[in-house]
UniProtKB/Swiss-Prot annotation:
UniProt catalytic activity: (S)-2,3,4,5-tetrahydrodipicolinate + NAD(+) + H2O = (2S,4S)-4-hydroxy-2,3,4,5-tetrahydrodipicolinate + NADH + H(+); (S)-2,3,4,5-tetrahydrodipicolinate + NADP(+) + H2O = (2S,4S)-4-hydroxy-2,3,4,5-tetrahydrodipicolinate + NADPH + H(+)
Gene that specifies this protein: dapB
GO molecular function per UniProt: 4-hydroxy-tetrahydrodipicolinate reductase; NAD binding; NADP binding; oxidoreductase activity, acting on CH or CH2 groups, NAD or NADP as acceptor
GO BP terms: diaminopimelate biosynthetic process; lysine biosynthetic process via diaminopimelate
A Gene Ontology term for the protein's cellular component: cytosol
Lineage: Bacteria, Pseudomonadati, Pseudomonadota, Betaproteobacteria, Burkholderiales
Binding positions (NADP(+)): 34
Protein name: 4-hydroxy-tetrahydrodipicolinate reductase
Pathway where this protein functions: Amino-acid biosynthesis; L-lysine biosynthesis via DAP pathway; (S)-tetrahydrodipicolinate from L-aspartate: step 4/4
């Protein structure tokens, strides 16, 4: 399996490269970075002190032409450009980018009719098992409990709330028979009045090098339940992305997420 990495000089990109290089069953076939990036032309393994023979490139079509899969944890505009190129080269996609709007998500769905795509807000096995716990908890705490989602990430993260927090909200809202857009409240300030018990609240923290912390609070009278997942390293995301690649080996097209990959449906 020949795998290319987008955003190859970034924190997640480097972790993906290292994880691919350490897996004897897959091969690093390309490393994409933005035009003008200082790392262009360097060996993709230079940051590890390794020579891979794969040079950092901004030529999307050339990289994907020699790749079976592209793992993309970048930004929405870049990912959409990569999708268009992947359709030209018949390359399958593992997408961990967050911050897409509804129209952009529709483009991903359309692309999945022609190639296999795993699209998820979080590739950690632990986070995806947590999603099932939240679904179960929401059904049992549907009355008399206020629901709040608190997430924390590093200072460089550009979107808030995180894609994972929003997915958690969607899972909870779905379990309660609601739509998230109808019940979400994003942060609070000033005189807000009493809390509407039908809402799901979100709070986002940005600071330091926090990889990703998510806590869902079910607050009742006399008790509260907290379900928390904390990521100490991006390695769990990279390992999950490789599981997604292996899952796509048996799917020529279609849109999937990590619940499909892990058999949690």
């Amino acid at each position: 399996m020949k795998i290319a990495i987008a955003g190859a000089s970034g924190r997640m990109g480097r972790m993906l490269i290292e994880t691919v290089l350490n897996d004897p069953e897959v091969k690093l076939s390309g490393a994409l970075d933005r035009t003008g990036a200082p790392q262009l032309g360097q060996d993709a393994g230079a940051f590890l002190g390794k020579q891979t023979g794969v040079l950092m490139s901004d030529d999307i079509d050339a990289v994907l032409a020699q790749s079976d899969y592209l793992i993309d944890f970048t930004r929405p505009d870049g990912t959409l450009a990569h999708i268009e190129a992947a359709l030209r080269t018949n390359t399958k996609l593992v997408i961990g980018t967050t911050g897409f709007d509804d129209a952009q998500k529709a483009r991903i769905r359309a692309a999945s009719e022609k190639t296999g795509i795993v699209f998820a807000s979080n590739f950690s096995v632990g986070v995806n098992v947590t999603m099932k716990l939240l679904e179960f908890a929401a059904r049992h705490f549907s009355q008399g409990y206020d629901i709040e989602i608190i997430e924390a990430h590093h200072r460089h993260k550009v979107d808030a709330p995180s894609g994972t927090a929003l997915t958690m909200g969607e899972v909870i809202a779905g379990a309660l028979g609601r739509k998230l857009e109808d019940c979400a409240v994003y942060a609070r300030e000033g005189v807000t009045g009493e809390r509407d018990p039908s809402t799901i609240g979100f709070s986002a923290i940005r600071g330091g090098d926090i990889v990703g912390d998510h806590t869902v609070l079910f607050a009742g009278i006399g008790e509260r339940i907290e379900i928390t997942h904390k990521s100490a390293s991006r390695l769990s995301y990279a390992q999950g992305a490789l599981r997604a690649v292996r899952f796509l080996e048996g799917h020529s097209n279609g849109l999937f997420d990590m619940q499909d990959v892990l058999g949690l449906r």
